[in-house]
Amino acid sequence: MTHGSIGPLLAADESFNHQIVDTFATVSQSDYSWTEKVCGMAAARDGSLSIGFGFGKYANRNIVDGYGGASRGVQQWTVRASRELASAPESIDVGPLRYEIVEPLKTIRVILEPNHVQPVAFDLLLEGGAPCVLEEREDRRTLTGYRHTANQVRYHQTGTASGWVEVQGKRVEVRPESWVMTRDHSWGIRPDVGLPIPDLVPDPVDGSGQKVLAVWNPLFFQLPDGSTYAFHQYFLEYSSPGFAHRRMQGGFEYADGRRELIVAIEPRLRFNPLNKRLLGGEFHLRMADGRERVLSAEAISDTGFHLGAGLYHGFEGRHHGSWRGRLDVDGEYFADCSTPESVARLNQFRDCIIRVHDHSTGATGWGNCQTYVSAVP
């Protein structure tokens, strides 16, 4: 029960972590696009199989949603779920999807229970190989400057996975020596939450003439002696007539908390012109201390979860945070995600599983490279 302008009281309100003058049921503003979200993946180092998952909490929409699924070659199985937040306000579990914080900022557990929608399930423990790292604030406005299209904080972590994945009745044991994981957690204002508002003035940046190259890429590296380190880069460049935006960040991350920061990234990437899938290439990096480093990358296989099935950039008219009733569970199977027809439904945004060579250390890295490109040269 609420009292005046104060939100409902939750068990979390017993803790000493309040930062606004309200209960934990309430966020600092009433924007309907305010979102708290986790997104992650785990993949076999040989590219034979990967899983993707995500959970979203939309306090101002009274909704929790999530997805989980598997990618094997060009095949993909996806399960989605959505529910009313008020039915269990202190949990982001939804339908057959479960999320557990085992050790804060270190280890989480994510579960997709056996379900009636698709023959896919998993139970995975994801453990960081380096501490969680805060990225720079995601801060973007419309071209006029009157509204934030993004204003959010995000941290990421890279490491290993253990547990099991089951697809079509066949169980695969997941071991930390042969699987990697990456995950992120964000909160704030983000684009593409709910259906587009029809009576807003069109934003020129969203026009068809926009040129885009986006790369978000965490990696887990292992040296020949068995020691490990992590890496993350985020490159975003887009422009349209009269407007240009270029941003980059990232660095190498170590178990003791040290970071070696990047000040410039030059991606030299190759894409399949039929479906815009990343094939490989190089990342030329300039470090904060002036050194130059080169990472050579190759797509290990066709495996890589299409995030459009999790409603990133929408899927067949559906978007994150939309009301679908007190509980809704659905999903689908794609026999071949690489065809132009499938990409038209799913969009090109995916967790391409890549293997990377660090020319400075001789280490080999594995991870997911999320890319979005407007045109392939």
PLM features: what roles do these ranges have?
Residues 1-377:
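Structured soluble/peripheral alpha/beta segments that form catalytic or ligand/cofactor-binding pockets
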